[in-house]
Amino acid sequence: MTKTRPDKRLITVRRGIIAFVVLTVVIVGGYGLFRSTAIDVSGEFVEGTHYKVIDGAPPVPISGPIRVTEFFSYGCIHCRNFDPMVNDWLRGAPKDVAFERNPVVFSPAWELLAQAYYALQATNALAENHDRIFKAIHDNGKQFLNAEMVADFVNGHGVTRDAFLAALDSPATQRAVAEASRHERASRINSVPSLTVADHYAINMDSVPRKKAFDVVDFLIAKIRAERAVTSGSAPH
């Protein structure tokens, strides 16, 4: 059987198509890389992508500490993994920032953990037990089904069992949990961990890597400072 010579024109057309496809891939890929790195190089973050304005949020206060809030629950494994990053940021947090943790009450079990948070805060035993509770639940599989189980766990760790239960049942703790729930709803929180700045901006935790979340927080803090400086006519600090 004899071989037929390939049509030179067909070969040329095929090579042209392949070259066009390769060039298109390079251009599109390069453009995508440029867009993804341009934000990192400039240090800019984009509203709608990295953060958003909370629906119905009040205006950013024109003075006073800039409030940064972490919404979390001891029952959330992602919050447990995020907590070291929160602590790292807190060690160098700006002096004009007021940071707070806001436990969410997505379920009765998480409401109990929110009550425990404020009871420990009221008895000055939060620092000693905050990480212990995270580890007990997520590293050791411990369940806290009622207040007595939490009281037994924290007993002797900065607080007595009776003092903890008294604080947990107090009107002050109930008010704190109610306010935390109100703040959660006003901030449109439906997943944790979540971060808000000045009760006006929310970090898009679904699109921002956890390790970059506080970069967006710092960006928004700087943005608020700059806007305040323009309003007051002074240079931002």
Show which residues each predicted segment covers.
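Extracytoplasmic thiol/disulfide redox context detector
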Residues: 2-111, 181, 222-237
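Alpha-helix N-cap/helix-start motif
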Residues: 79, 109-110, 143, 177, ...
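Extracytoplasmic/secreted envelope proteins and their assembly/folding machinery
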Residues: 83-90, 113-117, 130, 147, ...
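Structural microenvironment flanking redox-active thiols in thiol-disulfide oxidoreductases
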Residues: 92-123, 127-155
